[in-house]
Every structure is written in structure tokens, then in C-alpha cells.
């Protein structure tokens, strides 16, 4: 899900999705069932529902299970393997949540030590599971808008690391340069993601090398999150017909992003925390006159500035503009659409020009 969906890769994914829709592969059909996927599969489902379950076996040392599932032509065997992967995925989610919490505490100390200006986040700790550190690095990039390197140290004195980056910072090249300088036992990657193996006694040198290299190329603007908008609309216009028109531009992913809209002159009809520990914020929107209804959700926004702003605007009845992408909402056979919220603005001009 970090490889650009352009050229041949885009063609392969598009064709693969067509094949998946036939449900002829017993393993994929079973996986879709345990994941609760009752909609037409798209690239988002690959990255967020099916892919994590296929990978879950590898994250707990049972990597063959995913390939066994995909190779199976026995529906009964496939269902059993899919349930096993689903269970491991739940374990992975619990493990990831605990590691993210631990990592955030370390990062807060690092950010404070550098006055909030560290160009690259770099954290290492013994006891972390190497199978989830890439996911943790992605969460850190998402929250802090800067490259992140997360390393799990084992008892032998080696560390397995994953790095994730932002646009404009080639983290793969940085990791390869560190390897060539003798700071890594192994390592490589591409502009947005990389992996590495490092001896514990090289951690400080690696941290300094990456910090210096990335600081040379990154600017304050690079570290300021920006959202590129593809259009502006009002709540009544965000409907299934629009989503169907946009879906013809897919499959979406790196290099071919899902169209992002500003939803202008909107109000919250409802907004509430949902999920484990209120991790997400779910809402219903109307336009400023009360016309239309649009379901919306902000993932992992609970307790974060985005979620707090949404709840405050709903409580105070404020007009808002939101930035996000549209996704099909087929819950219980309903052919609707919902907004995946990425940002919210209150008390500002709400015109297409602004």
C-alpha cells in the first residue's frame, strides 16, 4: 500500500479487483467474509481490511498461513484459515495499540528535547514486537508530519527497524546511504518506506546521521501538514451518484490519490466518539440551512485536535468546512456515501475561492 498505483502496478491492481469481485478464489472470499466486507472490493479494502489480515500471520511468526489461504481451493479449509488470520489480526491490533502508546511517550520526550523541531523522529526500545513497528512508524508520521524510524531491539543486541516518510524526503535513499557508511547491518527501501537491521552500539551514530541528512533537505513547510483539495461542494451534492462517477478514476492509492473535497457551509447534526476508547469520531452533517444528510467519520481522531474540534463545533452549533474523501456506505444494504474527515475549520470564509 506504499507503492505508487501508476503504470503496470495500477493495471495489475485494477485487473486483480475485477477478479476478486467474482469471489472465485476460496481464500479471498473467506477473508472478505471474516472482515465483514459486503461491498464491492476496492483498493481501500485491500489496504485496510484484507491486507492486514493476510499479513497478520507474519507479524506473529506464522507467515505461511496467508499464502496457504490464498492457495486454498477448499472453502472449509479457507474459512478456518481466514478465522485464524482474523484472530491474529485482533492480537496485532492490541499489540500495535500498546506499542503506539509506548512510542508516543518516547516521541513526546524527543520532541520536547528538540523544541518540537526534530526533522526526523527516531526511537528504539527493547521488548517491542518487530512485526508492528512499521505500523507504529506510520502512526507517528500521521500524527507528527515528519519522517519516523522505529526500532525493536532483541536480546542479541540487534535492532529491526522500519522507517516511513513524507513527500519530499526519500527515506529509502537515506537508509541505503547509512548502510553504505557502515552504520547498518542491512537496509533498503523506497522514497516513502524502508527497513533496516542495526547493531545496538550503532544507534546513536545512526540517529545523528539520519537527523543531519534529513535536516539538510527538509524545510519547515515540509513539516507543516497540507491537504490538496480537488474540488468544493455542499452536503446535498455529496451523494452516491457523485461517488460512482469518481470511482471510475480508481483504483486509488499512492500516486493516484482519492479525490479530496472541501465540504462547505456545513453543520453537525450529531457527533460522537465511537470505537475502542472513543478512538474515532462519527458524525452526521447537513448544510447550514438543514438540507441534506451526510454521514462522516474521522478515524483515530479521538482525543486529538481534529476530534476535539468536531465535538466542540457540534456542541456549539458552529458552521464548519471539512476536508475529506468520499467512500461508499453499503451498511445493511444501504447504497449511500460517507465522508472520511481529514480536517475541519470553523469561523472562516466558506467559498470555493477561499
Kindly label every feature range from the protein language model.
Residues 149-165:
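Short glycine-cluster motifs
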Residues 9-52, 56-106, 138, 142, ...:
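Acidic, two-metal ion nucleic-acid-processing modules in DNA metabolism proteins
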Residues 51-53, 123-124, 151-152:
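Short beta-strand segments
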Residues 147-150, 183-184:
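A short linear hydrophobic-aromatic micro-motif
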Residues 117-119, 146, 318:
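Short coil/turn segments at beta-strand junctions that form active-site/ligand-binding loops
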Residues 4-5:
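A structural signal for small-residue-enriched, beta-sheet-centric alpha/beta enzyme cores
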Residues 109-138:
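Flexible, glycine/threonine-enriched loop-and-boundary segments that flank and lead into catalytic domains
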Amino acid at each position: 500500500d506504499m507503492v505508487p498505483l501508476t503504470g503496470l502496478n495500477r493495471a495489475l491492481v485494477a485487473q486483480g479487483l475485477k477478479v476478486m469481485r467474482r469471489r472465485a478464489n476460496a481464500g479471498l472470499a473467506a477473508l472478505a467474509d471474516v472482515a465483514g466486507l459486503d461491498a464491492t472490493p476496492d483498493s481501500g479494502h485491500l489496504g485496510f481490511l484484507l491486507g492486514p489480515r493476510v499479513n497478520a500471520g507474519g507479524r506473529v511468526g506464522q507467515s505461511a498461513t496467508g499464502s496457504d489461504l490464498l492457495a486454498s481451493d477448499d472453502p472449509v479449509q479457507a474459512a478456518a484459515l481466514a478465522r485464524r488470520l482474523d484472530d491474529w489480526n485482533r492480537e496485532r491490533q492490541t499489540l500495535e495499540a500498546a506499542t503506539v502508546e509506548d512510542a508516543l511517550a518516547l516521541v513526546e520526550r524527543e520532541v520536547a528535547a528538540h523544541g518540537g523541531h526534530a526533522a526526523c523522529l527516531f526511537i528504539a526500545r527493547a521488548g517491542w514486537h518487530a512485526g508492528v513497528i512499521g505500523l507504529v512508524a506510520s502512526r507517528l508520521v500521521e500524527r507528527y508530519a515528519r519522517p519516523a524510524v522505529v526500532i525493536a531491539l532483541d536480546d542479541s543486541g540487534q535492532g529491526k527497524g522500519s522507517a516511513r516518510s513524507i513527500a519530499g524526503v526519500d527515506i529509502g535513499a537515506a537508509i541505503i546511504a547509512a548502510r553504505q557508511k557502515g552504520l547498518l547491518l542491512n537496509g533498503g527501501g523506497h522514497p516513502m518506506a524502508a527497513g533496516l537491521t542495526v547493531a545496538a552500539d550503532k544507534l546513536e551514530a545512526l540517529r545523528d546521521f539520519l537527523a543531519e541528512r534529513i535536516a539538510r533537505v527538509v524545510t519547515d513547510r515540509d513539516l507543516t501538514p497540507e491537504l490538496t483539495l480537488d474540488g468544493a461542494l455542499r452536503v446535498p451534492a455529496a451523494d452516491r451518484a457523485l461517488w460512482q462517477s469518481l470511482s471510475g478514476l480508481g483504483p486509488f492509492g499512492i500516486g493516484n490519490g482519492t479525490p479530496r473535497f472541501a465540504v462547505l457551509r456545513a453543520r453537525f447534526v450529531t457527533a460522537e466518539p465511537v470505537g475502542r476508547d472513543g478512538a474515532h469520531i462519527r458524525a452526521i452533517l447537513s448544510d447550514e440551512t438543514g438540507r441534506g444528510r451526510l454521514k462522516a467519520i474521522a478515524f483515530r481522531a479521538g482525543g486529538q485536535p481534529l476530534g476535539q474540534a468536531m465535538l466542540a463545533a457540534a456542541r456549539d452549533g458552529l458552521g464548519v468546512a471539512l476536508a475529506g474523501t468520499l467512500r461508499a456506505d453499503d451498511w445493511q444494504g444501504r447504497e449511500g456515501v460517507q465522508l472520511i474527515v481529514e480536517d475541519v475549520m470553523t469561523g472562516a470564509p466558506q467559498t470555493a475561492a477561499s
